[in-house]
Amino acid sequence: MEHVVSAQLRSIVGNKRAVRRLRATGAIPAVAYGPGLEKPLSLVLNKTDFLKIFKHITESTPLTLVVKDENDKEVLKHLAFIKMVQYDKVTDEVKHVDFYVPEAHHKMRINVPIEIVGKAIGVEKGGIMEIIHHEVPVKALPDRVPEVIKIDVTNLELGETLRVKDVVLPEGVEIDMDDEDVLITVVVPRGLEVEETTTTETSNEPEVIKKGKKEEEEK
């Protein structure tokens, strides 16, 4: 699904009073920057329209940023990502948005959330799945950046770990971490370990007793 964010060039920059008036009209000040632009652009967003899109996207969601000037003439249409969002400390409303505009033919580095698929066998057996990293940094061309990295944990047993090298990635995407870094593990609960140890000790005990009796008989 394509997400299109519409914005207008903002002529008033750096004037706090003007920015407050802007927010009072139901608008959100924003800025766009990055190697895909000759210079940063000061923008204004329609609050209602932006929030409809914002609740469905993440930092790694590709957006089509469409910018128009005061005469409603389109001056920019480019792939972009949300780089940063500032919130009001009291109301928690969006106060400002930063858009990152990458170069089309150069790889970029961006954090992508992990999405767990399936239920681990180890969890079915009583283990606890521990997610070490909820998101990972990836390198890819802007149009190849995935919204999420899906990881199937179905075959993960008790005590097993899933590392960066085990992840199946889309073509043209690489995780910018060490191959041996652990992403997910199924921890064996202490009670489960004790139970297994007790069973082993019990099964070995009769052999020790029998062996002792045989030695006494030989004497």
UniProtKB/Swiss-Prot annotation:
Transmembrane segments: none annotated. Keywords: Ribonucleoprotein, Ribosomal protein, RNA-binding, rRNA-binding. Residues 195-219 are annotated as: Disordered. SUPFAM superfamilies: Ribosomal protein L25-like. Residues 207-219 have a biased composition (Basic and acidic residues). GO terms for cellular component: cytosolic large ribosomal subunit. GO terms for biological process: translation. The keyword Glycoprotein does not apply. GO terms for molecular function: 5S rRNA binding; structural constituent of ribosome. Part of the 50S ribosomal subunit; part of the 5S rRNA/L5/L18/L25 subcomplex. Contacts the 5S rRNA. Binds to the 5S rRNA independently of L5 and L18. Belongs to the bacterial ribosomal protein bL25 family. CTC subfamily. This is Large ribosomal subunit protein bL25. It comes from Fervidobacterium nodosum (strain ATCC 35602 / DSM 5306 / Rt17-B1).
